[in-house]
Amino acid sequence: MAGGAFELFAPQELGTEAYKYLFILENEKSNPASINKTGNKEYIFTRRHDPVINSIGFNITQGRLGNALYVTRKMANMYLQSNGLPINPQTWNYTKVDDEYKNRDNRMNNQLMVPGQTYWGTNGGRIDWSGNAAEIANASHRNFMPQTGMGYFPHKWCSERDGVPTGMEAYDFPIIRYAEVLLNYAEAVFERDGQISDEDLAISLNLTRKRINSEMPDLTNDFVTANNLDMRTEIRRERTIEFFDENFRIDDLKRWKTAEDEMPMNLTGVKWKGTDFENRWPDASFKEKDGEGCIIHEKGRNWHEKHYLLPLPTDQLKPVSYTHLTLPT
């Protein structure tokens, strides 16, 4: 952290969308600031891709953007308000389909598709980044309106570069990036000491928190105390938000020994009852709803202690008898 070789990707020209473009950075045509991969000092170790010699080989954008990949209400509720405080789902305004995206951590809009917005993909990409009528006409999703699944859809990893053939996206995949170093540090200090100083928060967690949220208050000990928050919860929240859709979540839940509480929860979606979704998504009327009027996508889930363990390969169990062992059930 003190070496200075790496830094968070936050070009001023990309403003509050810098986080989004980090994950789809290819050549100068992949973002409105004409930045290429040499401008990314955040990735430490990556799986490199190139459109000519080593493309990704799978059309991630087309398979994800507005498609059958769903996000839960649990995740949507974790994004902070722009004032740095958690939302209260019982009192938050959900009347219009885009209300819950307003005045939130900007990463929510960088990661999730907002109803009513326009999105570009490989089958309808950006032309000149002007947002003019011609570019909007070329968009793959105009006036996006969720009408399947749980109603939340991601657009992280979805390229906006025009004319990308199927499977030819070529942005790099981060195996470890500087943001992970920062948040590992914050969590490790807190877990070691049972507390963390404002100085340590300033050089770690608050850098990711404020990358595209310059007006959001810092997370400090006074802020936690004044707002009756829990520091461990906020550190874990920041990690969950920052690493959304990067395959960290299940390992984190196991590491924190909270999977037994989190995994059995119902998978719920948008609040449908009593909102404009009733008019905009009438086909969801048959879907089961919970007490808040939210779509229930899946229930009756369970978690057993054995799920904390990695499976034992059956071919490694054959040579020796393990009948004397008692495995968790």
Regions found by a protein language model. Give the residues of each.
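Acidic/polar-rich alpha-helix caps and helix-coil junctions
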Residues: 1-62, 83-325
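C-terminal/domain-terminus segments
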Residues: 59-76
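Signature of lipid phosphatidyltransferase scaffolds
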Residues: 75-84
